Amino acid sequence: MRKKIGSALVVGAGISGIRSALDLAELGYQVQLIDRAPHLGGTLSQLDYQFPTDHCGMCKMLPLVERDSSSQYCLRKGLFHENIEIMLSTELVALEGEPGKFQATLRQKPAIVDPERCTGCGECSGVCPVEVADEFNAGLTKRKAIYLPVPHNIPNSYTVDLATCTLCGECEKICPTGAIDFRWEARKEFRILVVDDELI
């Protein structure tokens, strides 16, 4: 891997955003990958396994650079790259500056479930009294107010839909690791510097 040469902000963690983040990280940039959704992969995350081979939907979308299939790598596993920081439920509010030196202002929704402590056991979802249409399955099934947004989520933790949650606290009581905390801060706003050292 090359020496770090600057930083980059990739807005949108769909398939093209993920691929861009991985390419920039391999070039040596420190990458902030943000998405306003609570999960990665965009629409492609709904195509978890594809017929007829059951290959991963994300990996099937990779361009084949060489004839040797080993030139491809798993997009999900690649996101654990040391140069990539993932910020979900985050949106770009403002962008100021000039080429090579930008200041980005980001706003992040509160995290009710701590992804570092959530084990993905599903106990919380089992006691949630709220049921709503599941967007992941195009409204054909139901989900709870606390739910796993997509299979193989990165990080593999549950999220709370504050628009439908009644704040009853049942999930917080049953969580075996204490990962759920409804005493959240309001939306956090912060600024990051996006720099290309070669242009400065």
Where are these regions (language model features)?
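Gly/Ala-rich phosphate-binding loop of Rossmann-like dinucleotide-binding domains
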Residues: A21, A25
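Conserved S-adenosyl-L-methionine
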Residues: E26-Q30
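Acidic-histidine catalytic/liganding microenvironments
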Residues: H81
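Short glycine/serine/threonine-rich phosphate/pyrophosphate-binding segments
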Residues: G17-S20, E170-K173
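Glycine-rich Rossmann-fold phosphate-binding loop(s) that bind the pyrophosphate
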Residues: G12-S16, C121, C168, D197
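Non-heme iron-sulfur electron-transfer modules
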Residues: G6, A37-Y73, M87-R117, P129-L167, ...
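Beta1/beta-strand and adjacent pyrophosphate-binding region of the FAD-binding site
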Residues: R2-S16, Q32, L193
